[in-house]
């Protein structure tokens, strides 16, 4: 086994552990599909590779709310897409990818829950 394969395996295991304590891209899509398309949800925008873990996904939180259907479209577009890491590299986002709330290039908070009306629950990384 090469050193790179070993490191990749460790990174994948750490990502699986993170996905147990916060929403994943697949879970957000599932939650949004259960909310009426015209419902207002948190104004999460600009999906990007998360600064803390480049293979995780982050959204910037903007003021106000947006339609659930618009956020759902952004989430579906991120599925399977490769994002450039903050210091380089390309990272493909998938169903089990943990999601964070953070500005580009910054660390942020874990997304725990997304609700109609614009509320989200977040938590800090351990």
Regions found by a protein language model. Name each.
Residues 3-18, 39-126:
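Detector for the mature cores of small, proteolytically processed
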Residues 21-35:
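DNA replication sliding-clamp ring fold and its partner-interaction surfaces
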């Amino acid at each position: 086994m090469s050193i790179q394969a070993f490191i990749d395996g460790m990174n994948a295991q750490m990502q699986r552990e993170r996905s147990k304590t916060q929403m994943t891209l697949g879970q957000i899509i599932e939650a949004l599909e259960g909310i009426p398309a015209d419902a207002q949800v948190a104004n999460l925008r600009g999906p990007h590779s998360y600064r803390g873990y480049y293979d995780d996904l982050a959204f910037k939180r903007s003021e106000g709310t947006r339609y659930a259907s618009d956020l759902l479209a952004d989430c579906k577009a991120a599925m399977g897409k490769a994002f450039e890491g903050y210091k380089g590299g390309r990272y493909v986002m998938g169903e089990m990818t943990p999601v964070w709330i953070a500005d580009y290039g910054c660390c942020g908070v874990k997304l725990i829950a997304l609700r109609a009306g614009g509320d989200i629950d977040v938590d800090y990384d351990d």
